[in-house]
Structures are given as structure tokens and as C-alpha cells.
Amino acid sequence: VKYWLTFNEINSSVAPMGALLNQGILNDLENPTVFMEQPDIPQQRFQGLHHMFVASALAVKMAHEIDPEYKVGNMMIYAASYPLTCNPKDVLVCQKYNRLYNYYCADVQAYGAYPAYADSLLKEMGVVLEKEAGDEEILKNGTVDFITFSYYMSSCQTADSKEKSGEGNILGGVLNPYLKASDWGWQIDPEGLRYPFSTTISGK
């Protein structure tokens, strides 16, 4: 085996559900199986994600030391998202969503450093990352060799809170009027699968 992955769907950690599903953090011991209703603590969640970035980088470095021919990638859930309208407010909301859900993890793991937009995203959520000495060097020296992703559906983003949310969409978003939905509420978008091939990293 020459191709390896570190964490599965690592970017699910940017969503509240990711604390339990991706990091194993359980804040409500009385209701351990109701993961969508677990109390969300962004500081805890993004700090955990930082540790995952460091662990992934160390794994990449170790794999290359074991066998220089090994290739190690990351793995994300790609949340294809479009502005609901051409209203500039919708476009900006969608840009912010894509940065958080689709670019944040890939940028750190592919470039080996936090992107410039990370500061404003984290500040808005009240998150201040605690970094250990050497973390930045570890990230820099442990970049992934390739990017992989899973894809299920797409959604639209809007600044209008009155729009109807997509049923079954655990990553957030509203219904796309141009798409049909499955029986469980996920909108069917085969074209959306083409989208990530040019947009999984921000390009800085």
C-alpha cells in the first residue's frame, strides 16, 4: 500500500456536529446519542481541529521517513455551495461559507500554514487558538501529497433568513430552486461534483 489518508472528512470539525462525530467530544453526558443537540463550544472544537492538523502533519512526515514513495493525503467532505441569488450579500455569505467548510482545512494541510482569512473567521466565533512551540514548523513540514473528498449534495447560501433550509442538510444551506431532492431531502446535483476539482484550495 502506497497511498494513505490521515483523518476522514476532517473538515466536518468546522460544523457543530463535528465535535462528537469527528473529534469524539461529548459535552452532554445525559444525551450522548443526540449529536445534533450537543452543546457547541467553538473554542473547544477548533482547538481540537488544530491538534488534528498537527497530528496529520506528523503522520505525513513519519510516512515519508518510513518509505519515501508513500503518498499521504487528507480527506474532506466537499460541501458544494452556491449563492442563492446574485445579490452581493448572498455572494459574500457564500464566500464565507466556502472558506470555512471547503478551504480552511485544505489550505492548512496543503500549504502548511493557516490562511490569511482564518484570523477573521476564528475571531468572529470567539476562537483563540493555543499553539504549542513547534506547531507551525510541524505544519510547514507535513503538508499532504494530495487532496481527497467525499461528495453528497450541494446547497445554496443566502443572507435572507426567511429562506427555507434544505431538509436533511446537516452542513447548512437553503434549497436550490433548480434542483430536485431525494426522498430524504438531499438535493441531487451531479454537476456539483465537478466544482471541487478547481476549488478545494483557495489559491491564497
Where are these regions (language model features)?
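Active-site region of glycoside hydrolase catalytic domains
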Residues: 1-204
